[in-house]
Amino acid sequence: MKSSRDFFEYFSPFLKNLKKGIVNIGLLDPKFQFIKQITVSEGSLNASIVHPREIMIPAIKESAAAFELIQNHPSGDLTPSQQDLEITHRLSKTGKIIGKNMVDHIIIGGNSFFSFVEEGLL
């Protein structure tokens, strides 16, 4: 997958109409080729809790060079929450420390998406 739109198009059919928040990671090899998708958290209508270790452990086990965080907002509102902003910062920082590059965090809502990279937040 070469862009955030590619991730959106892959994950959107699974996430856009759900009634609860789901957080996934897309794992990438050193050439940024898609390795695997893993669901790391299932939440409620308006919250989904995720800790950096839930992202990094699978990334390490699968020998991923990089990862993308993909989540849905069941409300359809693409505005990142304070929790979204904080976890993005923590994951980016943790990834740099252990050599797992965070390439983006996208939020899917309805038929659209928000990219932290495209909005200059990562």
Residues covered by each model-derived region:
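Short loop/turn motifs at secondary-structure junctions and domain boundaries
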Residues: 16-19
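Long, charged amphipathic helices and adjacent flexible linkers at domain junctions
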Residues: 1-5
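Short glycine-rich loop/turn motifs
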Residues: 22-25
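Active-site-proximal loop/helix of nucleotide/amide-processing enzymes and allied scaffolds
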Residues: 6-9, 13, 27-31, 41-122
